[in-house]
Swiss-Prot record:
Localization, UniProt: Cytoplasm
Name of the gene encoding the protein in the UniProt record: argH
Any single Pfam family the record assigns to this protein: ASL_C2
GO molecular function, one term: argininosuccinate lyase activity
Protein name: Argininosuccinate lyase
Organism this protein belongs to: Psychrobacter arcticus (strain DSM 17307 / VKM B-2377 / 273-4)
Cellular component GO terms, alphabetical: cytosol
Coiled-coil ranges per UniProt: none
Length: 457
């Protein structure tokens, strides 16, 4: 395909070392899709004859059928998916197949393939995210009154509902979905027609190709179009943030499944046992998702490092962009598939959650707020409650178990109505505002969540 310039054959090791067909054959369907659109545009612009284009398209469709049937013979000697497809096309249709590459370079061809492939994968990932979030809304709806400790510094802080906690997960994932939807807009720009780097001398019409391929825009500068991979980096960045959120969720599930917490159980099908300890039920799926987050972070660093020193325009370095991107997509997709099945099937241990909430003086802030409403300055109220907690620790009881007389020794602003504010249910109900953990607020948040998800349907 380019041997005319050279006086000796490429070394066999170099040919194998520089070939990408071992991995970029994954683009085959998208490569053929792009070629069919390109050929159609060449016909519409009277650059190729209609009969030639019809022959080329028929040949490309046969190549695709062979690939999908597993009958295609991939050749390292042909370097990449593009030349393998073109070579087979020429075998099928003859010399007319050599006309396909008119007005095109592999530089804009591969950039188009990546964008077509990544656009499709992004849509699949968004659909998985929506499925996962829908499952979380269903889970939260079942547990708007299920009380558990809310934590700061992994210490009991204030009572919340399990449903409220699940809705925090939902909000994380919703922002992740927004990021991917936004990244898709920049993925969905067409580089085809930029040729090697400067455009082509043929009178092409890029709008025809863009419309045929479903691109919402056209890359405006040929140098930039063939050489930048920021759209892939942006996707991988959004994927990394998403995996970070899933890693945090995994960490909580792992902790909560431990005997020391015993807050939740997940179905056995998401766990494994031990080869030596028969009692073990190991949370392998969340542990693996937590570990796989590091893998996606690494692929982001790979792509950033790959691009950081490249001058314009295309360089062979960019051959190394595909495997990190493939691995990122595969890792993220697998993690989402696991989570979409696992998370909605979490079963909380309500009794243990409630008992844990009672152990940590979780209503201390409620007592302080009560005092403030009765005219005590907050800093003074803070000290009063600290003294009451110290007494509770000494007596080995919760604040709600102290007598009225015991509480009143710290402040005469405490009346017999104080116990309404020291119950766990009262604490939840008191936080009755947008974003609060009151059961009716969580129910409203769930309803809003269902409406918000419709945007991505």
């Amino acid at each position: 395909m380019w041997g005319g310039r050279f006086s000796e054959a490429t070394d066999s090791f170099v040919a194998a070392f520089t070939a990408s067909v071992g991995f970029d054959q994954r683009f085959a369907r998208h490569d053929i899709q792009g070629s069919i659109a390109h050929a159609t545009m060449l016909k519409e612009c009277s650059i190729l004859e209609a009969d030639d284009v019809a022959t080329i398209i028929d040949g490309l469709q046969q190549v695709l059928r062979e690939i999908e049937a597993g009958e295609f013979n991939w050749s390292i000697a042909l370097e990449d998916v593009h030349m393998n497809v073109e070579s087979r096309l020429t075998d099928i249709v003859g010399a007319v197949g050599k006309k396909l590459h008119t007005g095109r370079s592999r530089n804009d061809q591969v950039a188009t393939d990546i964008r077509l492939w990544l656009r499709e994968e992004t849509d699949n990932i968004i659909a998985l995210l929506v499925r996962l979030q829908s499952g979380l809304l269903d889970l939260a709806e079942q547990h708007t009154d299920t009380i558990m400790p809310g934590f700061t510094h992994l210490q009991t802080a204030q009572p919340v509902s399990f449903g409220h906690h699940v809705m925090a997960w939902f909000e994380m994932l919703y922002r992740d979905t927004e990021r991917l939807v936004d990244a898709r807009r920049r993925i969905n720009q067409m580089p085809l027609g930029s040729a090697a780097l400067a455009g082509t001398t043929f009178p092409i019409d890029r709008t025809i190709t863009a419309e045929l391929l479903g691109f919402e825009g056209i890359c405006q500068n040929s140098l930039d179009a063939v050489s930048d991979r920021d759209f892939a980096i942006e996707f991988t960045s959004a994927a990394s943030i998403l995996m970070m959120h899933m890693s945090r969720m995994s960490e909580e599930i792992i902790l909560w499944m431990s005997a020391q917490f015993n807050f939740v159980q997940i179905p056995d099908r998401f766990c494994t046992g031990s080869s030596i300890m028969p009692q073990k039920k190991n949370p392998d799926v969340p542990e693996l998702v937590r570990g796989k987050a590091a893998r996606v972070f690494g692929q982001l660093m790979t792509l950033l490092s790959l691009m950081k020193s490249q001058p314009l325009a295309y360089n062979k370095d960019n051959q190394e962009d595909k495997e990190p991107l493939f691995d990122c997509v595969d890792t993220l997709t697998g993690s989402l598939l696991a989570f979409a099945d696992m998370l909605p099937n979490i079963t909380p241990n309500k009794e243990n959650m409630r008992a844990a909430t009672m152990k940590g003086y979780a209503t201390a802030t409620d007592l302080a707020d009560y005092l403030v409403r009765n005219g005590v300055a907050f800093r003074d109220a803070h000290e009063v409650v600290g003294n009451a907690v110290a007494l509770g620790i000494k007596e080995g009881v919760d604040l709600s178990d102290l007598s009225l007389a015991q509480l009143q020794q710290f402040s005469n602003a405490i009346g017999d109505d104080v116990f309404d504010f020291l119950t766990l249910e009262g604490s939840l109900a008191a936080r009755d505002h947008l974003g609060g953990t009151a059961p009716n607020q969580v129910k409203q948040a769930i309803s809003r969540g269902r409406t918000r998800l419709e945007v991505f349907a």
